[in-house]
UniProtKB/Swiss-Prot annotation:
Protein name as it appears in the record: Arylsulfatase K
Residues given in the record as Ca(2+) binding sites: 40, 80, 313-314
Glycosylation sites recorded in the entry for this protein: 108, 166, 193, 262, 375, 413, 498
Sites bearing 3-oxoalanine (Cys), chain numbering: 80
Family: Belongs to the sulfatase family.
Pfam families reported for this sequence: Sulfatase
């Protein structure tokens, strides 16, 4: 505990160091070093007011003071692997074809880090990567492939909380701390000796909820797990209990998600508040790991020469809209943190432009002075955060006034497309006709409780036309539908005679085993209905 408090005090002390040093740093002879820290499941709204009032995040606040924070940053796909594939490739999800957690980039895909290495950067990666194909559980894959099947099965256990009643327990997520230690040691023992600039990536699993190993009724449940040390960083009075629409009034895709996540039952206000409090405590632990990197850079006299970027692959619903996890275009799931500080980055700047994770790739190359490829979906963020960029009109024209996010994975029974503009969020599904779209005015309805698509048909039509100009989403949906069938058939054939037993014992086993033949028949019927994506 003492060491952590020393770290926090040191961080506060850093805020008053080197006044006016930004102009000198940007003129440094060699390209700056770059550190990218990416956590999992971090709600971006916690990095600015009023969300920032609910939990103490001293190092994120330090980055806000010393750098630029993007107030409207979004994931390009609110699930781990597809989101990270977009970030490492600079391409939208329909271009990477990273449809679910099983299908990501080819292991040999050229990432921004590969390009920087070819241009003289020393490179290193630690922790969670999760952007290549072939990972995650069988259950996760099968649930994604069969989301179009005409059945409704609970795929998750009821979300839970678990508290370590120890005020001195700081290192709760041991694996993340171990990876943070590795990154710090690399900075101390390797990076400090380099004459060339370096780029290092640290991937954290927090504040992603933990899988529960327990059997019984809540087998497979996700657990929000923390200690008293971190829970005391949370302002419980500031925790907001989210409003829920009645089950009968939920959008059909939302209802499917809520049901498969086992969230359609009764939850007390205490349960909901605990889940949210424990989640925020996990965010505080994440912030401390980010702080270890910042403090190491400071102690090694590298902070003045290094651009530090912090973001997350997606957010966490934490019981908003009667759901946990992500897999949704609602703000808690799709809105991510994005902060930058270092040489040439304007201090104390808050950027309201909409940006997304595909912008990381061109930003990295721009920092290194490397020409940008023409095929990227993203745009460099340096013009929006630079100390020296003066032409505001030109800045607005550099990054388009919209971002695209899409989802094709498990727990959602239709391909989903989100277009975020100034204050509008438009969400289209599947072929654009079979499922009602959603439109939210975030300026008057930040909690996204009122779908105004019918109320404002002209805006709905205009945004749908814009979405069509970016992506032929009915065709993409058909392609994903066909991919799901093909992959399921391959998997089923690989299982052979054990198929019935294996599929009955995946995460949905409690519901499946009540009527196994009914659900197998539903899959058989689905497989008989073939689609040709080229016909759309």
């Amino acid at each position: 505990m003492l060491l952590l408090w020393v770290s926090v005090v040191a961080a506060l002390a850093l805020a008053v160091l080197a006044p006016g040093a930004g102009e000198q740093r940007r003129r440094a002879a060699k390209a700056p070093n770059v550190v990218l820290v990416v956590s999992d499941s971090f709600d971006g709204r916690l990095t600015f007011h009023p969300g920032s009032q609910v939990v103490k995040l001293p190092f994120i606040n330090f980055m806000k003071t010393r750098g630029t924070s993007f107030l409207n940053a979004y994931t390009n796909s609110p699930i781990c692997c597809p989101s990270r594939a977009a970030m490492w490739s600079g391409l939208f999800t329909h271009l990477t074809e990273s449809w679910n957690n099983f299908k990501g980039l080819d292991p040999n895909y050229t990432t921004w880090m590969d390009v920087m290495e070819r241009h003289g950067y020393r490179t290193q990666k630690f922790g969670k990567l999760d952007y290549t194909s072939g990972h995650h559980s069988i259950s996760n894959r099968v649930e994604a492939w069969t989301r179009d099947v005409a059945f409704l099965l609970r795929q998750e256990g009821r979300p839970m909380v678990n508290l370590i009643r120890n005020r001195t327990k700081v290192r709760v997520m041991e694996r993340d701390w171990q990876n943070t230690d590795k990154a710090v040691n690399w900075l101390r023992k390797e990076a400090i000796n380099y004459t060339e600039p370096f780029v290092i990536y640290l991937g954290l699993n927090l504040p992603h909820p933990y899988p529960s190993p327990s059997s019984g009724e809540n087998f497979g449940s996700s657990t929000f797990h923390t200690s008293l040390y971190w829970l005391e960083k949370v302002s419980h009075d500031a925790i907001k209990i989210p409003k829920w629409s009645p089950l009968s009034e939920m959008h059909p895709v939302d209802y499917y998600s809520s049901y498969t996540k086992n969230c359609t039952g009764r939850f007390t206000k205490k349960e909901i508040k605990n889940i949210r409090a424990f989640y925020y405590a996990m965010c505080a632990e994440t912030d401390a790991m980010l702080g270890e990197i910042i403090l190491a850079l400071h102690q090694l006299d590298l902070l003045q020469k290094t651009i530090v970027i912090y973001s997350s692959d997606h957010g966490e619903l934490a019981m908003e809209h009667r759901q946990f996890y992500k897999m949704s275009m609602y703000e808690a799931s799709a809105h991510v943190p994005l902060l930058m500080m270092g040489p040439g980055i304007k201090a104390g700047l808050q950027v309201s432009n909409v940006v997304s994770l595909v912008d990381i790739y061109p930003t990295m190359l721009d920092i290194a002075g490397i020409p940008l490829p023409q095929n990227l979906s993203g745009y460099s963020l340096l013009p929006l955060s630079s100390e020296t960029f003066k032409n505001e009109h030109k800045v607005k024209n550099l990054h388009p006034p919209w971002i695209l996010s899409e989802f094709h994975g498990c727990n959602v029974n239709a391909s989903t497309y989100m277009l975020r503009t100034n204050h509008w969020k438009y969400i289209a599904y599947s072929d654009g006709a079979s499922i009602l779209p959603q439109l939210f005015d975030l300026s008057s309805d930040p909690d996204e409780l009122t779908n105004v698509a019918v109320k404002f048909p002209e805006i709905t039509y205009s945004l749908d036309q814009k979405l069509h100009s970016i992506i032929n989403y009915p065709k993409v949906s058909a392609s994903v539908h066909q991919y799901n069938k093909e992959q399921f058939i391959k998997w089923k054939q690989s299982i052979g005679q054990n198929y019935s037993n294996v599929i009955a014992n995946l995460r949905w086993h409690q519901d499946w085993q009540k009527e196994p033949r009914k659900y197998e028949n539903a899959i058989d019927q689905w497989l008989k209905t073939h689609m040709n994506p080229r016909a759309v």
